[in-house]
């Protein structure tokens, strides 16, 4: 059975991420969205909250499953017999970085390939970093994130 994985920190999940998940779900029978703990970053939301926000954002997609993970992505890929790794690439600088990761992941997973998805034009400028920055300065991100994330961000202000 073909299963692809879309890993990320998703802090928070954006409409750009959701767009890639929806497009991936149309192409593959099973999509695993893997939310990384990433201890090197100071997240806005803890891992459990990010997993829950992603689950709610993709609840309308029956072939998408969401998990959190603490290990190396390569370990998750091997444990779950993943067919391919999905990565979003917004720019040439993203591609350079993602290409290095793809080579490393191919080595660590005994050949699992990475597939690069460009964003839809509508979301090409959206990133979790931008969302956090706009939120920090009390800007309106309601058009850039799923509704559940917008409400979670509003609750952080209280």
From Swiss-Prot:
Keywords: ATP-binding, Coenzyme A biosynthesis, Cytoplasm, Magnesium, Nucleotide-binding, Nucleotidyltransferase, Transferase. Its main location: cytoplasm. It comes from the Bacteria. InterPro entries: Cyt_trans-like, PPAT, Rossmann-like_a/b/a_fold. It is an enzyme of class 2 (transferase). Its cofactor is Mg(2+). It catalyses: (R)-4'-phosphopantetheine + ATP + H(+) = 3'-dephospho-CoA + diphosphate. Its EC number is 2.7.7.3. Substrate binds at residues 9, 41, 73, 87. ATP binds at residues 9-10, 17, 88-90, 98, 123-129. GO terms for molecular function: ATP binding; pantetheine-phosphate adenylyltransferase activity. The record marks 17 as: Transition state stabilizer. Pathway: Cofactor biosynthesis; coenzyme A biosynthesis; CoA from (R)-pantothenate: step 4/5. It is found in: Cytoplasm. NCBIfam families: coaD_prev_kdtB, cyt_tran_rel. Reversibly transfers an adenylyl group from ATP to 4'-phosphopantetheine, yielding dephospho-CoA (dPCoA) and pyrophosphate. Belongs to the bacterial CoaD family. Homohexamer. This is Phosphopantetheine adenylyltransferase. It comes from Pasteurella multocida (strain Pm70).
């Amino acid at each position: 059975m073909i299963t692809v994985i879309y890993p990320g920190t998703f802090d928070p999940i954006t409409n750009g991420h959701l767009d890639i998940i929806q497009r991936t779900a149309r192409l593959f029978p099973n999509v695993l969205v893997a939310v990384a703990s990433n201890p090197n970053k100071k997240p806005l939301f803890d891992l459990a909250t990010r997993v829950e926000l992603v689950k709610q954002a993709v609840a309308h997609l029956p072939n998408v499953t969401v998990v959190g993970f603490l290990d190396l992505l390569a370990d998750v890929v091997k444990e779950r017999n993943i067919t391919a790794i999905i990565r979003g690439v917004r720019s040439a600088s993203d591609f350079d970085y993602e290409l290095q990761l793809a080579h490393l992941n191919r080595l660590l997973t005994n050949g699992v390939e990475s597939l690069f998805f460009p964003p839809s034009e509508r979301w090409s400028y959206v990133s979790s970093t931008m969302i956090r920055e706009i939120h920090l300065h009390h800007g309106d991100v309601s058009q850039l994130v799923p509704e559940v994330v917008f409400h979670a961000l509003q609750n952080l202000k209280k």
